[in-house]
């Protein structure tokens, strides 16, 4: 079915970071993972030829399908203009203001994985079932101290619970990507720790992970162009040695939040 759609519209893929999921088994598993109900409005980013779109529409109240590629937008209109519960939005998902939605289910364009994930996490929704490159997914869920533990891990944990549901081999796509993929379940929730200022915390995490191999004392001093803390050396000297003598990659999100809160309080005096 999926291959026949690609052939019918002479779609090759490869532009706009396109890798079409053609394995029906994985498509069906994604739909099951989304736990759809007839009351759900679903956002799909990078709808492609609509192979996932049509499966979502069978179970959901409405599917909002966002697609950038004009050729694929034409395919979606041709296939679904007469389907009442599918709305096609032509545009860049990073720039489009999303309508209200309950769940997001997508085979995401890999080149915008970070930006689109953090854009999504600013919206209110119940559940996300999202396809990423496997290495990216591993970074989202890594425990502290592992090589995959990163700014992405901490930022994701601040906004949501994330877990890898399944690994998807590159052969399940056409054209096949260079690496395997993974389906990630995202469940937004209130942060499990308190921060004084969210914008400062996120900037602090970005700063210290830009020098993840350095001790926190040095990474803070070296990235003050981002943090903009007056009298930075004096401020850092007031931080507990237990924190500043460790690397960012060895601190839990809660510990990083504690340091960010102390810095914010000290800079605000």
Curated annotation (Swiss-Prot):
Pfam families named in the record: RrnaAD
MF term (GO), any: rRNA (adenine-N6,N6-)-dimethyltransferase activity
Database matches in SUPFAM superfamilies: S-adenosyl-L-methionine-dependent methyltransferases
Domain of life: Archaea
Subcellular location: Cytoplasm
Membrane-crossing segments per the record: none
GO biological process, one term: rRNA methylation
Keyword rRNA processing part of the UniProt annotation: yes
CDD domains in the cross-refs: AdoMet_MTases (cd02440)
Family matches, as InterPro entries: KsgA/Erm (IPR001737), rRNA_Ade_diMease-like_C (IPR023165), rRNA_Ade_Mease_Trfase_CS (IPR020596), rRNA_Ade_methylase_Trfase_N (IPR020598), rRNA_adenine_dimethylase (IPR011530), SAM-dependent_MTases_sf (IPR029063)
Binding site for S-adenosyl-L-methionine: 19, 21, 46, 67, 92, 107
GO CC aspect terms: cytoplasm
Matches recorded under Gene3D superfamilies: Ribosomal RNA adenine dimethylase-like, domain 2, Vaccinia Virus protein VP39
Family statement: Belongs to the class I-like SAM-binding methyltransferase superfamily. rRNA adenine N(6)-methyltransferase family. RsmA subfamily.
Function as written in the Swiss-Prot or TrEMBL entry: Specifically dimethylates two adjacent adenosines in the loop of a conserved hairpin near the 3'-end of 16S rRNA in the 30S particle. May play a critical role in biogenesis of 30S subunits.
PANTHER family: DIMETHYLADENOSINE TRANSFERASE, DIMETHYLADENOSINE TRANSFERASE-RELATED
HAMAP family with a match to the protein in the record: 16SrRNA_methyltr_A
Protein name: Probable ribosomal RNA small subunit methyltransferase A
Taxonomic lineage: Archaea, Methanobacteriati, Methanobacteriota, Stenosarchaea group, Methanomicrobia
């Amino acid at each position: 079915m999926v291959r026949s759609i690609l052939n019918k519209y002479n779609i090759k893929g490869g532009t706009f970071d396109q890798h079409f999921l053609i394995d029906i088994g994985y498509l069906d598993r994604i739909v099951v993972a989304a736990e759809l109900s007839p009351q759900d409005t679903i956002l799909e980013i990078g709808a492609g030829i609509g192979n996932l779109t049509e499966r979502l529409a069978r179970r959901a109240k409405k599917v909002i399908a966002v697609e950038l590629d004009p050729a694929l937008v034409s395919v979606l209109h041709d296939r679904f203009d007469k389907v009442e519960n599918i709305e096609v939005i032509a545009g860049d998902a990073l720039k489009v203001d999303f309508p209200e939605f309950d769940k997001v289910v997508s085979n995401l364009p890999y080149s915008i994985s970070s930006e689109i994930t953090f854009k999504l996490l600013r919206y209110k929704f119940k559940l996300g079932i999202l396809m990423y490159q496997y290495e990216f997914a591993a970074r989202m869920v890594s425990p502290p101290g592992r090589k995959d533990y990163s700014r992405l891990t901490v930022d994701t944990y601040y906004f949501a619970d994330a877990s890898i549901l399944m690994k998807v081999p590159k052969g399940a796509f056409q054209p096949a990507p260079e690496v395997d993929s993974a389906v990630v379940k995202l469940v937004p929730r209130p942060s499990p720790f308190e921060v004084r200022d969210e914008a400062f915390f996120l900037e602090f995490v970005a700063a210290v992970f830009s020098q993840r191999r350095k001790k926190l004392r040095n990474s803070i001093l070296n990235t003050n162009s981002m943090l903009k803390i007056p009298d930075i050396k004096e401020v850092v000297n007031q931080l507990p040695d237990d924190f500043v003598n460790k690397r960012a990659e060895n601190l839990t999100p809660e510990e990083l939040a504690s340091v960010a809160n102390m810095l914010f309080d000290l800079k605000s005096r």
